[in-house]
Regions:
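A structural feature that tracks compact, well-ordered secondary-structure segments
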Residues: 99-103
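An alpha-helical repeat/solenoid feature that recognizes helix-turn-helix modules
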Residues: 1-95, 111-150
Length: 153
């Protein structure tokens, strides 16, 4: 309704979209619903972590390093999980889901690849070691997201 088009850097969308997603669905205003949809579509156009003008390249290398807690930063794991939780199932999510699958270690766990250790009183987990939080989120993505079938016409 006369609102300006969404112009925002995709890496700034993660924290904002997370905040809007925290609002229970029945309590989301029409404006919040539209904002979620616009933000999700922008991320999907980027295949969640790619450059929009070159989908063969990662937009930001840090997006492919899974971390916990994310705070103001984000990564492909957090974004794909967020979109799944919001009910999105789109073939443009497949690369991110496959990235998650590819990072699984032989023992079935995922490593903490990025961390804010040193920024808190206590370190959550050790970088380079198996992470219960990354593993939990990755398993949720693989269980709930799966690979979305691409429709052929």
């Amino acid at each position: 309704e006369g609102a300006a088009p969404l112009v925002v850097a995709p890496d700034a969308l993660g924290p904002g979209l997370k905040a809007f997603a925290a609002i229970p669905a029945p309590r989301r205003s029409v404006a919040v619903q539209r904002t979620i949809a616009a933000g999700a579509e922008l991320l999907l156009r980027h295949h969640l972590f790619k450059q929009i003008h070159n989908l063969g390249r990662v937009a930001k290398p840090g997006w492919t390093r899974f971390g916990f807690p994310r705070m103001y930063q984000t990564d492909a794991l957090e974004i794909v999980l967020l979109l799944i939780e919001l009910g999105y199932r789109d073939p443009r999510m497949n690369e991110a889901i496959e990235l998650v699958r590819s990072r699984r270690c032989p023992d079935g766990r995922w490593l903490l690849q990025d961390t804010l250790n040193g920024s808190f009183l206590v370190d959550v987990e050790q970088k380079g070691e198996p992470s219960k939080w990354i593993t939990l989120n990755a398993l949720r993505v693989l269980q709930d997201g799966g690979l979305v079938a691409v429709e052929r016409s």
